[in-house]
Amino acid sequence: MDREEIKVAVLRMEGTNCEDETVKAFRSLGVEAEAVHIKQFYSDMIRFEEQRSVFDYQCLVFPGGFSAGDYIRAGAIFSARVKSVLRKDIEEFIKMGYPILGICNGFQVLVELGALPGFDEDKPLAEKPEMALAMNDSSRFECRPTLLKKESEKCIFVKNLKKDVVMFPVAHAEGKVVFPSGKEDEYLERLTSNDQIVFRYVDEKGDYAGYPWNPNGSFYNIAGICNATHTVFGLMPHPERAFFGYQVGRREGYGDGYCIFRSVVDYLEKL
């Protein structure tokens, strides 16, 4: 697929944020990207020229924010709206090998959708959530740079990432990765054996450490995971806020987040 043929949809609704940064990151790589309201996929109230299909795109992104005010649970309402009208389309999209990225609130949406941890390759969306992103151990909103160690070689979103440790900022109150009580060891074994743990929080020496390096108390210091096919990726930190050098205090060039977006574009060019 030629780069100019690639189309990316950044899904939005009331309360999401960083859509513009995410769109700009993709566009800077020469692909077509747009922010698309969830209603554009199903509402008859939308003008014909603004109506969209999931299959108009080769990559979907669920951005950060506080969708629907994070009422009930973070990402729950956004997920419910997607599930009610797009479940079959999303499942087919994943089976086709097209990538989906969930950033912060978007990670929460993918968990609520049952897309992550995504152990079953034949059933991309579980019937109910198999993990959760709970309130931070600090019981408050955490907003600052974090250091992340790359753990996966198979996730398509980190194929171009050469550094062992990267810096992405976090901005969340509910980012603690938790698994069902009594199944933590089982889940960890499944994730590690299939190379599904993508990033873990570390300190300035590259060692796994607790708070404040792990900003939320996530199990096993997990910051991001992918599904069994390594094409659906969710993480709490924000790579789009570290895409350009000027976002992270550099005068020129790119930040560490550049490699996330470049990796998925390179993947799509090979399809």
Curated annotation (Swiss-Prot):
Listed under GO cellular component are: cytoplasm
Where the protein is mainly located, per its record?
cytoplasm
A single Gene Ontology biological process assigned to it is: 'de novo' IMP biosynthetic process
Matches recorded under InterPro entries: Class_I_gatase-like, PRibForGlyAmidine_synth_PurQ
Sorted alphabetically, which Pfam families does this protein's record hold?
GATase_5
Q: Which residues form the Glutamine amidotransferase type-1 domain?
A: 7-253
Checking SUPFAM superfamilies in the record gives: Class I glutamine amidotransferase-like
Subcellular location(s) of the protein:
Cytoplasm
> Sorted alphabetically, which keywords does the UniProt record give?
ATP-binding, Cytoplasm, Glutamine amidotransferase, Hydrolase, Ligase, Nucleotide-binding, Purine biosynthesis
Q: Where is the active site?
A: C104, H238, E240
Q: Which reaction does it catalyse?
A: N(2)-formyl-N(1)-(5-phospho-beta-D-ribosyl)glycinamide + L-glutamine + ATP + H2O = 2-formamido-N(1)-(5-O-phospho-beta-D-ribosyl)acetamidine + L-glutamate + ADP + phosphate + H(+); L-glutamine + H2O = L-glutamate + NH4(+)
> Would I find Transmembrane among this entry's keywords?
no
Query: Any idea which GO molecular function terms this record carries?
Result: ATP binding; glutaminase activity; phosphoribosylformylglycinamidine synthase activity
E.C. designation(s):
6.3.5.3, 3.5.1.2
Pathway-wise, it operates in: Purine metabolism; IMP biosynthesis via de novo pathway; 5-amino-1-(5-phospho-D-ribosyl)imidazole from N(2)-formyl-N(1)-(5-phospho-D-ribosyl)glycinamide: step 1/2
Q: Which SMART domains does the record match to this protein?
A: GATase_5
Disulphide bridges in this chain? none
Summary of subunit composition and partner proteins: Part of the FGAM synthase complex composed of 1 PurL, 1 PurQ and 2 PurS subunits.
* Role, per record: Part of the phosphoribosylformylglycinamidine synthase complex involved in the purines biosynthetic pathway. Catalyzes the ATP-dependent conversion of formylglycinamide ribonucleotide (FGAR) and glutamine to yield formylglycinamidine ribonucleotide (FGAM) and glutamate. The FGAM synthase complex is composed of three subunits. PurQ produces an ammonia molecule by converting glutamine to glutamate. PurL transfers the ammonia molecule to FGAR to form FGAM in an ATP-dependent manner.
User: This chain belongs to which protein, by name?
Assistant: Phosphoribosylformylglycinamidine synthase subunit PurQ
Organism phylogeny: Archaea, Methanobacteriati, Methanobacteriota, Archaeoglobi, Archaeoglobales
